[in-house]
């Protein structure tokens, strides 16, 4: 979670957005050629595909770049809250119930197997 400040801005390069159903489960993929906007004007609770990283967050106090080895990104920007979330994830939520879970990032691990991921946050105070 990140504090939503007066000039919080989010920049993400991606190709698609997953829209949720009434239960907030991702069910429909639509084209979304990136995000570049003030967070106060966004209303997302979505997963994004084709994330090329880094995700950039900037406001009057700091500049942040988020990089990850994970291929999907969840962005949550509730309009009535003083925070927002930008979260790399390994798979689309609800992937286990989709026709081809692996195509949506869900990895099946055998006993003893592991899955590794990394994330880096570079922060500069302004």
Please identify what each model-predicted range represents:
Residues 1-69:
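Active-site/ligand-binding surface loops and adjacent short beta/alpha elements
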Residues 7, 15, 72-73, 83-86, ...:
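Generic secondary-structure boundary/loop-capping signal
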Residues 49-51, 77-80, 113:
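A structural signal for short secondary-structure junctions
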Residues 54-56, 85, 116-120:
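Beta-strand secondary-structure signal
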Residues 58-93, 99:
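Glycine-rich active-site loops that engage anionic ligands at enzyme catalytic sites
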Residues 60, 95-103, 118, 122:
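Active-site-proximal mixed secondary-structure blocks
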Residues 89-102, 108-110, 114:
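Catalytic-pocket segment enriched in acidic/His residues
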Residues 107-125:
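Short Pro-Gly-centered flexible turn/kink motifs
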């Amino acid at each position: 979670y990140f504090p939503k400040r007066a000039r919080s801005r989010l920049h993400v390069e991606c190709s698609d957005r997953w829209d949720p159903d009434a239960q907030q489960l991702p069910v429909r993929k639509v084209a979304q050629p990136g995000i570049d906007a003030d967070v106060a004007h966004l209303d997302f609770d979505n997963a994004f595909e084709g994330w090329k990283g880094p995700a950039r967050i900037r406001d009057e106090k700091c500049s942040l770049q988020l990089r990850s080895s994970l291929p999907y990104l969840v962005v949550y920007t509730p309009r009535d809250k003083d925070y927002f979330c930008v979260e790399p994830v390994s798979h689309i939520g609800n992937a286990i119930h989709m026709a081809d879970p692996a195509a949506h990032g869900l990895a099946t691990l055998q006993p003893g197997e592991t899955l590794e991921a990394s994330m880096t946050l570079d922060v500069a105070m302004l």
